[in-house]
């Protein structure tokens, strides 16, 4: 299904107190809402510090194809906050205080028969993996076949850590109001790099993210090590979420899940190519050869270059497909003799997936040539 839009889901994540106060409601004047700004700053810190874990929480084999394309956010974690909040953040960083909040503009429809609409100051950005949408965040990386539980465990834990660190510091402050103000400015300045309101699909963003030092974990295999870092052990251990042993086990299971999924797909591809595609192309080459022979016999002077060129092209692609299938078979056999699940997963990504692509290339070309029959 290459080129067909992948399927995912939006994990709407909101935060409210036990008395019903929405901690993510900026109000009419966000620049004056100190509680909201502190919560936002803590979330920025959490996502920036643990971007690798958040990326890993949405790692499934299918997302390797989906993220960064097919109407899905990129694999680079960033936060979209909209023009209004970005302006407030920049005011606080540059001057130490925010004096105003932008209001929404007008959305030009470009259609003379339709009116222009008021544009929300937060707007929406479908290319962002973690977007603020008025009074909540949307985490948009979770794959359709995956549970949202892993993503929410990570989100809740990393934000809890940021809240705890903020609370520990503020509870010791002699001047609470001044301490809150200073903390907001400090956190916003330290983690400003995680804010990105632009086009997440662009190559320019990939380059900019690298300059900012943001991780770009393009595939599931690259993201799994985030589970077994000292940072992860401390985070989940301090809050009683996972022990070190549980995280190591989860990483092993993730490697196994990836490897088995790719192996099944590779075997399916070998089967399809061997039992359906190659026989169909062989039948078509026979038809072409018979046509060419019949034309030559019936009218030697007739131009048979079309049949000749087509027969040569199809035969060459058939040979390419046969060679690629044999190569993939050999790699699948080699995979069986690798004992470590981590090494199996890397072997799948580094060797088997490129071999699968090498097999599908001639098959895709033949699909545009060989008739439906």
What residue ranges belong to the model's regions?
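Active-site capping/gating regions of soluble enzymes
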Residues: 1-253
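C-terminal amphipathic alpha-helical interaction region
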Residues: 189-373
């Amino acid at each position: 299904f290459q080129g067909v839009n992948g399927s995912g889901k939006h994990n709407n994540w909101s935060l409210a107190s036990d008395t019903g106060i929405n901690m993510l409601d900026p109000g009419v004047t966000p620049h004056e809402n100190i509680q909201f700004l502190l919560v936002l700053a803590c979330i920025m810190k959490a996502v920036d510090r643990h971007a690798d874990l958040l990326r890993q929480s949405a790692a499934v084999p299918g997302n390797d194809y989906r993220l960064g394309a097919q109407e899905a956010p990129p694999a680079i974690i960033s936060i979209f906050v909209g023009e209004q909040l970005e302006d407030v953040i920049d005011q606080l960083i540059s001057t130490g205080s925010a004096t105003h909040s932008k209001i929404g503009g007008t959305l030009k429809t470009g259609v003379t028969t339709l009116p222009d609409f008021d544009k929300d100051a937060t707007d929406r950005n479908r290319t962002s993996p973690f977007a603020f949408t008025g009074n909540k965040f949307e985490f948009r990386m979770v794959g359709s076949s995956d549970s949202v539980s892993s993503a929410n465990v990570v989100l809740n834990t990393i934000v809890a850590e940021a809240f705890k660190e903020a609370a520990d510091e503020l509870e010791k402050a002699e001047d609470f109001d001044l301490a809150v103000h200073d903390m907001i400015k400090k956190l916003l300045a330290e983690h400003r790099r995680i804010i990105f309101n632009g086009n997440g699909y662009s190559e320019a963003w990939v380059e900019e993210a690298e300059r900012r030092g943001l991780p770009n974990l393009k595939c599931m295999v690259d993201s799994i090590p985030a589970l077994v870092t000292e940072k992860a052990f401390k985070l989940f251990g301090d809050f009683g979420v996972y022990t070190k042993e549980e995280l190591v086990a989860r990483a092993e299971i993730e490697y196994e899940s990836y490897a088995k999924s790719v192996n099944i797909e590779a075997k399916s591809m070998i089967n399809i190519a061997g039992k359906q595609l190659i026989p169909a192309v062989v039948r078509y080459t026979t038809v072409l050869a018979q046509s060419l022979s019949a034309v030559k016999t019936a009218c030697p002077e007739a131009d048979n270059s079309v049949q000749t060129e087509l027969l040569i092209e199809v035969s060459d692609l058939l040979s390419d497909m046969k060679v690629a299938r044999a190569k993939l078979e050999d790699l699948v056999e080699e995979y069986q003799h690798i004992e470590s699940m981590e090494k199996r997963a890397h072997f799948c990504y580094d060797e088997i997936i490129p071999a699968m692509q090498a097999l599908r290339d001639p098959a895709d070309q033949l699909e545009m040539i060989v008739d439906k029959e």
